[in-house]
Amino acid sequence: MADQLIRATAADGGIRAVGVITTNLTEEARQRHRLSYVATAALGRTMAAGLLLASSMKQEKSRVNIRIRGNGPLGGLLVDAGLDGTVRGYVQNPSVELAPNAQGKLDVGGAVGQDGFLYVVRDVGFGYPYSSTVELVSGEIGEDVTHYLVTSEQTPSALLLGVFVGKDGVTAAGGLLLQVMPKAARDEALVAALESRLGHLTGFTPLLRSGKSLKDIFQELLGDFGLAILPEVQLLRFDCRCSFPRVLGALKILGQDELEDMIEKDNGAEATCDFCGEVYQADRHHLAQLIGEIQREKAEKL
């Protein structure tokens, strides 16, 4: 099944629902960064969360950055997701592995840590980005992002995230975001019924692994709440904006002396993109061209 995002409403627009399947892009991230099992789960959950948060933005170039910094051995995570369905991200310590938790599941909370902060930056592509910071609740990602939504955006929300990774890689990943809009927030019976239904779920990936589609899951959860599934299915993908010209631009900033030193000692330079793991090689000729540009720019200022 292709990675995808679908939207729906229920209760006469009182409930907003968004679901994502991110199996393939999570597997791509696992391979690119050579992630451990628990690092795959942590990054996969965060990428799904980023796409779900970005889905509510309006401007075409809108993006969401989620940065998590806990006291666990994973170090930190950074995810960049766009309204256009693209996402990228990385983990500071990708090889960290932990024993399963008390429930026999991947110990994402232990890897991330419970003491720390979650930072969210919403950027619409112009003006000043909106940023918010909340303390981590559990390090399990889903609970932490839900805490952000309730605290910073003051929207009653339920967020389900899941990644199933085994010896053959990622076989199921995705998430579901349900939000009660202001028009329905005072309907205590509706909120209670929704909370009860969500409380009976054992997680998101079991639903995917049982063969259910996002529409099936929406129908199961919201079918008797006047569910209306929007027809558009948005495709999602792991995508990075890094490029060789950007690498050359970054090298140029180092200045002539540093570039000459690289030529003399290493016969060139190598750069690796943190977000996607792509390795770029700049040989001595590329660096010499940069030095020439620097010299010409200096001469023009005289």
Curated annotation (Swiss-Prot):
Annotated function: Redox regulated molecular chaperone. Protects both thermally unfolding and oxidatively damaged proteins from irreversible aggregation. Plays an important role in the bacterial defense system toward oxidative stress.
Post-translational modification: Under oxidizing conditions two disulfide bonds are formed involving the reactive cysteines. Under reducing conditions zinc is bound to the reactive cysteines and the protein is inactive.
Protein name: 33 kDa chaperonin
The keyword Membrane appears for this protein: no
GO biological process, one term: protein refolding
Swiss-Prot/TrEMBL keywords: Chaperone, Cytoplasm, Disulfide bond, Redox-active center, Zinc
Family: Belongs to the HSP33 family.
Pfam families xref list: HSP33
Subcellular location: Cytoplasm
SS bond partners: 240-242, 273-276
PANTHER family membership: 33 KDA CHAPERONIN
Entry's Gene Ontology molecular function annotations: protein folding chaperone; unfolded protein binding
GO CC field: cytoplasm
Gene: hslO
Top-level division of the source organism's lineage: Bacteria
